[in-house]
Amino acid sequence: MGANEFRFFLSCDINSPVTFRIEKLDGNLPVKKSSDSGVVSIAEEKKPELYIECALYIDGAPFGLPMRTRLKTTGPPYCWNELITLSSKYRDLTAHSQLAITVWDVSCGKTEGLIGGATVLLFNSKMQMKSGKQKLRLWQGKEADGSFPTSTPGKVPRHERGELERLEKLMNKYERGQIQSIDWLDRLMLKSLDTIKEQESTKHGSSHLFVVIDFCSFEHRVVFQESGANLFITAPIGSTNEFVTVWDTELGKTNPSENKQLKLARSLDRGIIDRDLKPSNIERKSIQRVLKYPPTRTLSGDERQLLWKFRFSLMSEKRALTKFLRCVEWSDVQEAKQAIQLMYKWEMIDVCDALELLSPLFESEEVRAYAVSVLERADDEELQCYLLQLVQALRFERSDRSCLSQFLVQRALQNIELASFLRWYVAVELHDHVYAKRFYSTYELLEENIIKLPPGVNGEDGYQLWQSLVRQTELTAQLCSITREVRNVRGNTQKKIEKLRQLLGGLLSELTYFEEPIRSPLTPNVLIKGIVAGESSLFKSALHPLRLTFRTPEEGGSCKLIFKKGDDLRQDQLVVQMVWLMDRLLKLENLDLCLTPYKVLATGHDEGMLEFIPSRSLAQILSEHRSITSYLQKFHPDEHAPFGITATCLDTFIKSCAGYSVITYILGIGDRHLDNLLLTDDGRLFHVDFAFILGRDPKPFPPPMKLCKEMVEAMGGAESQYYTRFKSYCCEAYNILRKSSNLILNLFHLMAGSTIPDIASDPEKGILKLQEKFRLDMDDEACIHFFQDLINESVSALFPQMVETIHRWAQYWR
């Protein structure tokens, strides 16, 4: 480091807690005097029991909680050598932050005796943070005064300082490495220092007490600076006692010189030079670090410049295209033109990256058209995984009949499931007043093209196919009417069920036998012919959802679904779609966790359908069978197997518990209780009711994941090999899904314009919470330890058990 070079840290950049060490108390404690003498008395026959209380004051006000040392009884000197860490951080400090230190004696009986106090500023007159050892003189009989200015300064006044203080100051510099170390001279100096200490002690007697503390030292000096810039620069206080705001018109604007330099650096005339540029090792590492950034991270100016500079050498790296396109200055026509030319010459990107190009970050029609061309490579099953988000992405298009809408319609013409779901997804968004015209245009385009279809193998032409889809809407309207009628019935759940069957057998008997079969909204490949009144019922809950059994053309065939009115199922639809996608990603890595991604379809903002899976809630199982193990023994007994359950059933239960533990943690699913955890006869556990996602939860202190002690007991307890296997499945699944974090983040980014409550409230915050759950700052091994700690924390959480009891009482009285 040069002689004129001064390296430093800014206090606002240090995110560590304030830390220092209490070394010792120097001097003799005062002897017992009269009670009115103003000095704390210490009985000669009692040994002092001392502790030191440390508190941080900012601008004269206490900040954070005070900390105490342990008791000390042996001395003098009374040596603690104890590290104190405050709850406040260095970045929170102001220029007038000070530490208040008070020494107490608890040997006096019931009341604590005050020895004395002192305060010390954390920054010196040069606005540099103090470091190293500090010797503070106590004001005996006074508690440390944290106000500013203080009445108990620990700094010894200049006129009272002697030779000892001067030497101690030099000693402090020596320990910080600011004075050169010479071995033989150091030994002589230390001996002389001890002699001077004895002389000074004899000279001044024992009139003063000193506390020695050691402040934390950093690699460089720490200079005070507040975080953030103040946009309002106030003038000094004048005689008029008025505040005057002075506006700096250039504050926040770009620097013309920097703009000029940037233009020259990105000049198209440099294209010939840039073609042959190759990054150095340091630049290559920087580029690789940028390419690993999640899609939600904004690139800095230097990072954008770096990618633009080496754009030609990066063309073989398909991961770099989306990052490169974010570096382009699209307002510059020539630069945008070159970027489009390079885009078509770039290595073909994956479908996951194409989804990022459809986000609101990219407005260029050419870029969005390129993304659609990449999506054409996806098969129908993969496309259905993203269909919900692709419909939401229509909001970010620049025209009503965009490439994306035409692509979705063309693929829907080839697959009846895609056609049915596309129609419903678009129809639900017609309630969005801002984009209603955009979605209606896509709806019309779908209708026009389906009607033109020629007859298929079964003789059904395009017009008949469209009418079968329209009749789905008519069916949901009639089910809404039934729900309202049933809710108006006074009485218990049984009376409401009787009313439901009465309606289906009387006024609405046409619903038991349709004139023509209707395609099931949940499974469009399945035709339904009518409702079986005797097998239909409703659930015991506030909204009384209908549980309906429909006939199918096969002899004795049926399908069951749930119709819900009064609840926004779009959020459930999104979560279950994510479960389905994650199940697919896990299976691609040969990990089948026996998940149950049941079908959900929102048919409006307050209505929808769900697939009915025969199962029972954990609350019901524990109430009737006392344990999950007893319940599974009933359906899959095996006397020779562990816990009396077949190995297949137990393995299914463990895998499904692991799968949903990981998924609900990543998606931040809230409001988990034993009534929305269901278990099938074959051991598959799954979650329902996703009213709270992305970290929102109506209950206080929710655990990271829902893993109750009954589930752990069903695996043989926390010490069993099966619980170890469960944790192994969790960690393996977590690391697999982390590899696809960009895909999941891109899908949620496409939902940013949605009116789904938990996303619409703050889309950016929700996506950042999701990104945080993936812990992209860790490697796979570190994530294994991290997730195991999460599991242990969730199992031992006490508060959720109390909330679960309260919830059971509420269900009982419903």
From Swiss-Prot:
Q: Which UniProt keywords apply?
A: ATP-binding, Kinase, Nucleotide-binding, Transferase
Function (record text): Involved in the negative regulation of proline, hydrophobic and aromatic amino acids accumulation, especially in response to salt (NaCl), either through inhibition of their synthesis and/or promotion of their catabolism. Triggers defense responses (e.g. pathogenesis related (PR1 and PR5) gene expression and hydrogen peroxide H(2)O(2) burst) to the bacterial pathogen compatible Pseudomonas syringae pv tomato DC3000 (Pst DC3000) and incompatible Pst DC3000 (avrRpt2), by regulating reactive ogygen species (ROS) production and by promoting stomatal closure.
Q: Its Gene Ontology biological processes? A: endocytosis; microgametogenesis; positive regulation of defense response to bacterium; reactive oxygen species metabolic process; regulation of amino acid metabolic process; regulation of proline metabolic process; regulation of stomatal closure; response to bacterium
| Entries under Pfam families matching the protein | PI3_PI4_kinase, PI3K_C2, PI3Ka
Domain PIK helical, by residue range, is: 274-449
Q: Where in the numbering of this chain does the PI3K/PI4K catalytic domain appear?
A: 532-799
InterPro entries from the UniProt entry:
ARM-type_fold, C2_domain_sf, Kinase-like_dom_sf, PI3/4_kinase_cat_dom, PI3/4_kinase_cat_sf, PI3/4_kinase_CS, PI3K-type_C2_dom, PI3K_accessory_dom
Extract the ranges annotated as region (G-loop): 538-544
Kindly state the subunit structure of this protein: Interacts with VPS15. Component of a complex made of VPS38/USL1 and PI3K main subunits such as VPS15, ATG6/VPS30 and VPS34. Binds directly to VPS38/USL1.
Gene from which this protein is expressed: VPS34
Domain of life according to the entry = Eukaryota
Which residue ranges are recorded for the region named Catalytic loop?
668-676
Top EC category: transferase
Summarize induction of expression: Induced by salicylic acid (SA) and upon infection by the incompatible bacterial pathogen Pseudomonas syringae pv tomato DC3000 (avrRpt2).
Outline the extent of the C2 PI3K-type domain: 25-177
Spans annotated as Activation loop: 687-708
Q: In the UniProt record for this chain, what is stated about the effect of gene disruption?
A: Homozygous mutants are lethal. In hemizygous mutants, increased expression of ProDH1. Reduced proline accumulation in response to salt (NaCl).
What stretches pass through the bilayer? Answer: none
What name appears for this protein in its UniProt entry? Phosphatidylinositol 3-kinase VPS34
**Keyword Kinase set for record:** yes
Q: Which Gene3D superfamilies match?
A: C2 domain, Phosphatidylinositol 3-/4-kinase, catalytic domain, Phosphatidylinositol 3-kinase Catalytic Subunit, Chain A, domain 4, Phosphatidylinositol 3-kinase, accessory domain (PIK)
Q: Which SMART domains match?
A: PI3K_C2, PI3Ka, PI3Kc
Q: Annotated Gene Ontology MF terms?
A: 1-phosphatidylinositol-3-kinase activity; ATP binding
Q: What is stated as this protein's family in its record? A: Belongs to the PI3/PI4-kinase family.
**Catalytic activity field:** a 1,2-diacyl-sn-glycero-3-phospho-(1D-myo-inositol) + ATP = a 1,2-diacyl-sn-glycero-3-phospho-(1D-myo-inositol-3-phosphate) + ADP + H(+)
E.C. code: 2.7.1.137
